[in-house]
Amino acid sequence: MTTDSLIPVVVNGAAGKMGREVVKAVAQAEDMMLVGAVDYNPNYRGQDVGEVAGCGALEVPIVDDLQSILVLATQEKIQGVMVDFTHPDSVYENVRSAIAYGVRPVVGTTGLTEEQLKDLADFADKASTGCLVIPNFSIGMVLLQQAAVQASQYFDHVEIIELHHNQKADAPSGTAIKTAQMLSGLGKTYNPPMVKETETIAGAKGALVDDNIRIHSVRLPGLIAHQEVIFGAKGEIYTLRHDTSDRSCYMAGVLLSIRKVTQLQSLVYGLEKIL
């Protein structure tokens, strides 16, 4: 492939744990070209992003100015893609900026509110620019969610437990929220009360979301990303669990999303929509 036919990719949050994995994956992809790396950690400013990611020099320095890199991405012959793994406080403005420049966002940062998602969807529609918001890039997690939807036909009681490393800023996780949304969109109400319940400590039973589904969040060092969906019925428990042991497991989904977003003209939410 010539460089003119490669997908130009900007990684925002390039020095973070997920950002480094994305840098390595894009650098190894035959149909992509890393054109920019952004991170606001001053310890990495000016360093070669390949050296930071551990894949060797790529001659792409880490900068702390997203706007200038978006401008650079628009100068390529093929419309660029921005992969965002940053922070819930900044992701909304990052995505709006990318769309405004005609750069297609692939968003792995969780924490966007329903209102923000709606606004970004409207903005992407008006700009006819593809945008993917993916709470979890793992194929295994998509399969778990699909299995949970199928199981919900036979169980009326369900709770979700999500466990992550203690540097994750938002709770509950976007993946757990997405799972609850998939279950709550099936036209049934879960967990009918069996006794009069009292919480002696507020929040002891977890966060209540749509259709009476509860999510419990755990944050501990030593964890990466894990989720259980537990169904209960008289005399039995059915547990679905997904465990991440290495962040490289997300890269197949990230690369697929980069390729797919170039074909979209609107915002799409969830990896299952593009599989």
From Swiss-Prot:
CDD domains: DHDPR_N (cd02274)
The enzyme's E.C. designation: 1.17.1.8
Source taxonomy: Bacteria, Bacillati, Cyanobacteriota, Cyanophyceae, Oscillatoriophycideae
Pathway: Amino-acid biosynthesis; L-lysine biosynthesis via DAP pathway; (S)-tetrahydrodipicolinate from L-aspartate: step 4/4
Organism of this sequence: Rippkaea orientalis (strain PCC 8801 / RF-1)
Span of the signal peptide: none
Recorded GO CC terms: cytosol
Residues reported in the UniProt entry to bind (S)-2,3,4,5-tetrahydrodipicolinate: 165, 174-175
Residues the record marks as active site: 164 (proton donor/acceptor), 168 (proton donor)
Alphabetized Gene3D superfamilies for the sequence: Dihydrodipicolinate Reductase, domain 2, NAD(P)-binding Rossmann-like Domain
GO molecular function: 4-hydroxy-tetrahydrodipicolinate reductase; NAD binding; NADP binding; oxidoreductase activity, acting on CH or CH2 groups, NAD or NADP as acceptor
Pfam families reported for this sequence: DapB_C, DapB_N
Functional description taken from the UniProt entry: Catalyzes the conversion of 4-hydroxy-tetrahydrodipicolinate (HTPA) to tetrahydrodipicolinate.
Gene Ontology biological process terms in this record: diaminopimelate biosynthetic process; lysine biosynthetic process via diaminopimelate
Family: Belongs to the DapB family.
Superkingdom: Bacteria
UniProt keyword terms in alphabetical order: Amino-acid biosynthesis, Cytoplasm, Diaminopimelate biosynthesis, Lysine biosynthesis, NAD, NADP, Oxidoreductase
Binding site for NAD(+): 13-18, 108-110
Protein name, entry field: 4-hydroxy-tetrahydrodipicolinate reductase
Catalytic activity, reaction form: (S)-2,3,4,5-tetrahydrodipicolinate + NAD(+) + H2O = (2S,4S)-4-hydroxy-2,3,4,5-tetrahydrodipicolinate + NADH + H(+); (S)-2,3,4,5-tetrahydrodipicolinate + NADP(+) + H2O = (2S,4S)-4-hydroxy-2,3,4,5-tetrahydrodipicolinate + NADPH + H(+)
Main location: cytoplasm
Localization terms from the record: Cytoplasm
